Amino acid sequence: VSADAPYSTYPELIDYCKEHPGEVTMGVEVGGFTYMMVKSFEAATGVQFNLVDVGSHSDKCTALLGGHIDIMPNQYSTAKGYIESGDFVALGFPAEERSAVYPDVPTAKEQGVDWLYNGYEFGFFLPKDTPKDIQDTFDTAVAELMEDEEVQQAILDLGNEPTYLSPADYESQLADIQTEYEDLWAAANAEA
């Protein structure tokens, strides 16, 4: 949010939104990851935003800086310069634990808000007819790569946390995310 917003924590935002339903303008990419993230927040907290499609992560920063939106979900790495300059305030992070990348940003849970949301998921996908031995070789190479300290630091420097999941675990996680998205999408369409 902008540094001059009337809220600087999740509880303050929730209280403000409940007092001003539909008035807080949230910049998203409709149908994209941040849209689903916002719909998840609305469902968990009972608030309602005025959602505006403003485009990419950098477009959201421009819109917030220009006062065209009131709040945005964004990657910390994209907004970091604005946070450091004092233009933006990070309300929090929807995770169980604070991030190693931005340890000064409290979690929603720490602020008393019962809301968790999966972070940005990056993974490798191979054509479905890729032979099993090639899949296994690729997986072993990725697992070894993710143990390399230089690779881990490079990922941290980009504002992400390095993690590795086996193909089976990643497939299971994606199935859970798909189910969550389908539920959120159905609820969003029911509102329209």
Segments (PLM) and residue ranges:
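Hinge/capping helix and adjacent helix->loop/strand transition within the periplasmic-binding protein
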Residues: V1-D59, E110, E121-A154
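Conserved functional loop/turn residues at catalytic and ligand-binding sites
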Residues: T9, G67-H68, D87, G112, ...
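Structural motif detector for alpha-helix initiation sites
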Residues: T9-Y10, V105, P167
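Ligand-binding pocket segment of bilobal, Venus flytrap-like solute-binding proteins
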Residues: E23, V28-V105
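An extracytoplasmic/periplasmic, membrane-proximal ligand-sensing/linker region
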Residues: A44-T45, K132-A192
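C-terminal lobe and pocket-closing loops
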Residues: T78-E147, T179
